[in-house]
Regions:
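Short, well-structured N-terminal submotif of metal-dependent ribonuclease cores
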Residues: 1-43, 58-69, 149-153
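Short acidic, glycine/proline-enriched helix-loop-strand junctions
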Residues: 74-92, 96, 103, 134-153
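Acidic, PIN/NYN-like endoribonuclease modules and their adjacent C-terminal/linker elements
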Residues: 1-5, 112-153
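Active-site neighborhoods of divalent-metal-dependent phosphate/nucleic-acid chemistry enzymes
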Residues: 83-129
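Helix-adjacent hinge/juxtasegments
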Residues: 54-86
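Alpha-helix/helix-capping structural signal
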Residues: 11-12, 46, 113, 132
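Short beta-strand segments at enzyme active-site cores
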Residues: 42-45, 128
């Protein structure tokens, strides 16, 4: 029987494929611990888009400066290991509902879309470095990689 379902936020995915990131060891540890506890780690098409955006954006604009081919290679790493939560009409409708009911504006629309996918696919936890971004959504538990890694120490 599988353990807890987690959506892995883009900020975690980006650190997972970049060994020179200062948070890389923490992310690797948190993911390994989650998998040892039979957690099912998930992602969405939105995560891939955010990941791709950062990977292919120039270094001088706070990106990784990778080619699309290298971004594809790195995305394939997590796509092989994680479960895709597919987009659907239900996800779109839940997202639209969240935008209005939670008075969402600006870049917050992206996190609302992740929450919509989580709700439709019954995922209650998101592994993220930005817990506050998900605080407005009841029933969603934002888990920092540090707290997940500390759970089993």
């Amino acid at each position: 029987m599988p353990g807890a379902l987690y959506l892995v936020d883009s900020n975690v995915l980006l650190r997972w494929i970049k060994p020179d990131d200062r948070d890389y060891p923490l992310v690797v540890s948190a993911i390994e611990i989650a998998l040892q506890n039979d957690a099912v780690l998930c992602y969405t098409s939105q995560n891939v888009g955010e990941f791709w955006n950062t990977c292919t954006r120039p270094l001088e604009r706070n990106g990784y400066g990778l080619s699309p081919q290298e971004a594809d290679r790195r995305a394939a790493i997590f796509e092989r290991k994680l479960r895709l939560l597919p987009d659907s009409l239900a996800v779109h409708q839940e997202w639209r509902r969240l935008l209005v009911s939670h008075n969402v504006s600006g870049v917050q629309v992206h996190d609302a879309r992740l929450v919509a996918a989580m709700r439709v696919h019954a995922v209650k936890r998101v592994l993220t470095f930005n817990e506050k971004d998900f605080a407005r959504y009841p029933g969603i538990e934002a888990v920092h990689p540090r707290s997940l890694a500390a759970e089993t120490r």
